[in-house]
Structure formats: C-alpha cells, structure tokens
C-alpha cells in the first residue's frame, strides 16, 4: 500500500475531484518545504477523476443498489482518472455464467470488465468513496438479486432484547368491583448470528361482590419460541422451534420442528414483487420512460438495439404500463403493456423454496388424531410472460399431499392462476383420496378505475383432506370430520370515483360436505375527502345458516366523519384537534359516538374525549384518556363512565436492549433488531432517524432496513458549542434482528484559533495538517497562509501534532487554564511554538 504525507491525502479530494483537463498545479504553492528535490508528479491531479493510486475503502453499488463495503486497489487509467482493480472472484455470481471468464484472472482491471460486459460501466467518486458498477439486466447473475453481499452483513453483538406492554383496569359497579392485569413481552437473545425469540404473557383477574371474596386468579405462558440463523450464500434462513408452514397452495399450519426457507427480505427490493419485463427496440441511443397511472416510475437510457427492462418496482397488483421511447433525433414512439399480477407471481429468474420437518402443533386442540412426523416442501420460480410455476407436498405416515400450480399474465385480460392438489389420508383405517382445485384472477382497468384485486374459487371433493382436517381433533365437535370444506368463493373489488372517493366491495361464501351449513360475508364501503373533511360509510353482513348451526344474520351499518377543529373556529389552533362523529347500527341497536382528539400543547401527549349514546337503556357513556408517546416510554391513562360502572384503565409500553457493558431503552419495538447510537454518555443528542440519546448516552434506532446499507446521522445543528463531532454520519449493513452499536466520538472542549510558529519564528507552512494528540486524528485542521488553524472540542491542556512534506513534523504543548472564557461560544486565540 502506498503511503503519502497527510497534506497530499487531503488534496486528493480537494484537487482531484474538481480538476479539469489541462489544469496544472505549481508544487511550490502547496507547502514551502515540498520542493523540487521531492520530485512530486502532480500531473495526475490535472485530469478529471485523477488522484494518487493505492488502496482505498469504498462502497460498491451495482445498478444504483448497494452491494458491499470493500478495500480495492486503484490505478490511473488511460484517461488519467483513478480506476478500481477488482480481486479474483469479485464478479463470481454477480455476472451471468457466459460473462464470468474474467474471474479466472488474478486481478481484474476496469478495462477487463468493460471489454467483456457490453454496455457495462464503472465510475469512481472520490469525494464519497463510492464505486458504481452498471451491468445490463441480461448479464446479471444470482448474487445481483440480493440487497447486498452476505459478507458485508453485520451480525451485531451479543444482546438481550425486550419489548414489553403492561396494562390493567379497575371496574367499580353496583355491588362490587373487579381488577385485571395483563403483561406481555417479546423476548430475544442474540449470539454469534443466532437469534432466539419467544413471547410470554401473564394475566390475572379478581372480583369482589356479595358472593365472591376476591381471590386472584392468574396464568403465565410462553409461546412462539424459535431459534434462527441466516445462511447468506443460500439466500435462506434456518429456523427451529414453534413454527408455521408457508402455505403456498392450501392453508398453512403450525408445527414444532425446523425449516429452512428462501428469505425474500434478502432480495433486492425491485425483485421482491412481480414486475413484468418491458421489451422493445431502440433505433438509436434513446430514453425509455415507463408510466403507470400517469406517474413516471422509471426513466432509463438504453443503447441502440433490443432492450429488456425489469429493474423497477410497482405498487399494487395491476395497472397498464405506458412505455415511451424517445430517440436521439427527438422522434418518439410508444406502446402500452398491460399489467396484472397475483401474490404468487415472481420476477423472471427468481426462485423460492421451503423445507420443513416436524410434528403438527395446534394449541387450540387438546389432542390430535395422528402425531407422526411430517415433511413439507414447496418451490416456486418465475419465468417469462408472467408465468410462475409452484408446487408443494406433505409426506407423513398416514397422510400424503401433492399440489402444483401456475400463474399466467393474460395481457389486457388481467392475470390468472390455477392449482390442483391430490391428497391421500388413512383415517380410522379407511383410505380417503380426493382432489382440490383453485382459481384466482386479478385485473385493473385504468380508464374506469376498476380493480379486481382478487377473485378466488376453490372446490374440494368429498374425500379431500387438508393436513389441518386430517390431524386436528376436537371432541366437542364430532361432526367436524364430515364437515370439510366443499367450495369457497371470494371477491375483492375496488372502484375509483375520482373526486368522489372510492368504493370497495369484499364478499365471500363457503359451504361444506354432508351439511347444509353455509357461511356468507359481505362488506361494502365508500370513503372520500373534501377540503380536509373526511367521510366514510359502510355496510356489512355476516350470515350463518344450516342444520348444525343456529341461523345468525348480523347486519352492521356505519357512518364516520371527521373535521379539523380549525375549520370550525375559523383559525389555526395549537392542539391540532379533530372532531369526529361515528354512528353504527348493529341489527336493531344504534350507537352514536362524538369524539374530540388532539395534542396537548408543549408536550408529547395526546388527549381524547368521547361521549356515546344509544337507543337502549343505560347505554350512554363518557370517556377521557391521555396518551404519552415518548422517546423512552409510551403510556396511557383513561377513565370511562357507563351507567353505574366506573372504569379506570392504564398501559405502559417500551423496549430495552442489554448488550456488553451498556443499556439502551426506548419506546419502539426492538425485537426485529436495532442500531444503538452511543455518544460517550452524553445525553440530548438528536438522531435524524428518530429519537435522542438518554442519560445513558444511548439512543435506539429501529428504522433500519436489514441486509442493506443504512445511514445514521446525528443532528449537529442543535448541539452545544463546546461539543465537537468529527463524523456525524455512519453506515451499517445489519442482519435482520441484529443489534449493532454505532459509536460516535464526541469531544467536549473549547473553540480555539491556534497561531503556530516553528522554533525559528516562521509560521508553519501553508497546508500543514494539525491534529490533537490522543484524538485518533479526528480533531484535525489545516494551517492557513498566516500559520493559523481553527480547532473545536479542545480540552484545557494537551499536545498538538503538526505535519507537512515528507517526514516533516513538530509538536506543541498548550495549557488554556490561563485563558478564561465567559461562555462556550467564545473563540479563544492561542499562540504556540511547534518544536
């Protein structure tokens, strides 16, 4: 690795990143002690992107997506600009197999890469230490599907995590009172990339009245306990414990055992949901613009010839794509590509799988018909033209199932999927063999605003058993074995009404074998907003009928409206309050509720007051509650009066992370991992991603996205003047669930302008680098042409180190105790001799 004096290191960015062709820099202008004898060749700075060759730590991005942090060697290319040299194997699995011949070389230059990858590009930005590699989609390999390289993931530190919620209430009524308490916690423990998670709760209840002395009854439970670890090179996660299957074709089920599955969270965001491949031909260097619903979702330059584009993401399940191609001469041509999708659809070339092994586990059933172990496996892969093939199988001693399915894009007619499953169940010494068939359909009609989000139909023969049907047993419902699902139909429909809001319809019906039991549900709602006023109406029907069930028809009508209080009083007000009214009719009972809610001025609290009344006796109620949303704790306190009942309720919730020698507390959930900002036990430092450091000098940041680069920035605008932060922005690439400490070096001290001279009385050379000894060179400044340097965060006494040229340096001791300062804003002048 090449070594250079500090001054040249500082100048690499200052000169190289702003140079233009033909610039020339006189070495004598840089520092008086860097002369001709040193024979420095500064011509490398006279080219755009020029600089000193050698190793650098950089962030590598592929097609504008973060890939990894790595140390690369750099050399000056033919143009004079710095170009990275990649190690052998760097492009393994980044490039598709026909373009991997470069991996056989020990070192891969930028020129090697460009010669083998058509339309490829490499760009280095010295100022931010970033290397951008552009690779056409057709040439990308498996690793390019991932958010980042697994070797860049941060497993975090050993840590104990907890999310907790405590709640309770006390109810006083005519002849007595009752109390209940509920505590719920999500617990986690991380060690060497393994993550243990479990959920626990405690419930207690007691009641006092004329016949009850008030004995407390309580219960304590653990559930959903599992251990997991990521396997990056497989894009997978291994999980052991209390789990559930994916349920790709039929419904999922709970079990105890283990599974390994492809983790879609590791996928590049653009590949996590299905998006069609846009294909076309450009006659020249052209700009392709793709719109959906009038919104530009991608604009990309393409070279002459055929092109394929699929590196973009879409929201929703449908919506035609409008593709415009603008040629170099200004001419344009366009076409429409219909687009509809289904949840099962995957991007072309993206696969998914799951393999599970264990015993059935359903806490709702006291016993099972059969408890033999099972094997579950599923697989899916996306192909061209919106086709995704998928399958699943279950193999057990007395039960076997095989299911296959496929999706298909129908262009203007939407998207459809179909599946078929065969089951064989040996139950009560009798063989039952049956089939189940399913259809799904999705379509978006842009010009009318109609979206059939999902229409499904499933039919099962009389002898078809799902695994839940076969294994579960509940003695209280003996007929359940003969009451298996026969068919089910569901519909979800949305209709845009433009300025008049939107209309939504959800309906379903299902019936069963050997029974006329029918279950129906229907929901219709309409909502729209006008001038900050919101309206919503709804109707729902829940109907159950049949020989084995009481006829039950629940009809619910609802109306809701809200308006900002400022609209009513005609001016802005500090509480940002909203007045709302809600009315519901459930069969023959009508309930009305009026609510006023807003913020408590000058605090992190919100209030809510409501009054309710109905068309039944003693049904009126009034309620008042206050909620607190803090950085360290959330809480609420409420009081409700209903008839002769008086109810007081409360809740507290928050989170904590305990890791080596430190503790961090917060209000947001940490069970899925977090970054912990450390600021040398200094409190009150705000984090731009949310929160601020507590008295412990820590702040929890839970907005981190796993498997990709995240920035964490301190807010330096509001820190005290006697604090200095050398680097207020840091980056991490966490695994999911990881606890990653992010330490910031803060220096508490004074603001000083040092005037430094050498032993002969001459000022230190212009451009000399001065740093505080013991600060790891984080408190550093550059001498100006008068021999002065400004430094912040300076203690009362210490030593400064100055360096210039090759092996030219000196040190000066300082003591500021004799330099009184009335406030931290004052800048102190200090003169010293550097020896």
Curated annotation (Swiss-Prot):
It is found in: Cell outer membrane. One of its GO terms (molecular function) is fimbrial usher porin activity. The keyword Membrane applies. Disulfide bonds join 810-834. Belongs to the fimbrial export usher family. Involved in the export and assembly of the 987P fimbriae subunits across the outer membrane. This is Outer membrane usher protein FasD. It comes from Escherichia coli. The lineage of its organism: Bacteria, Pseudomonadati, Pseudomonadota, Gammaproteobacteria, Enterobacterales.
